[in-house]
Amino acid sequence: MAKSPDDMMSAVIGSLADRTGRTLEEWLALVDASGIDPLDQNAVRRWLRSEHGVPQNSQWAIADAAARAAGWVRPTVEEYVDAQYTGAKAALRPIYDALAEAITALGNDVSVEGRGGYTPFVRARQFAAVAPAARDRVDLGLRFTDPPASGRLQPSNGPGQATHKIALRSVADVDAEVQHLVRVAYDQNG
């Protein structure tokens, strides 16, 4: 089973001193002294990279810890999903809901994670991701090690870790073929 994002963050934090020469507490003091808004995690990561050459995973861990210290609370999966399907994209939510139901029904080893722009579904590794791509389209990203033949699959490098994607414009598009392709991705990533 894949490590949770919190487990991975803890592992990165545990190795910060070895990887960067500073502990998390030392990095948080530097971020605080820099004058950068700790709630702007992108700005903190840019500063860590440009000024200190901090590796990417360490940037994420430090920026996350700085934001949490400033009062930020990570949204729940449902809050991330709600934010993705608001405004002009609110009409796409039923497509997401149909996909999420089909994907999570594959097994109790499927976990759903929250992201700002897409929703990943993970088994041993991410095998599916759902993203509101346009006002009238949801992209279903699937990760294959051996892609099946299907005219609906488009080679892709997103959303998430997808090797292929399918454009969906209605709940009716979440049909038997799409569910079969999701099952193949699930089976190949367990």
Name these PLM-found stretches:
Residues M1-G190:
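Charge-dense, helix-prone N-terminal extensions
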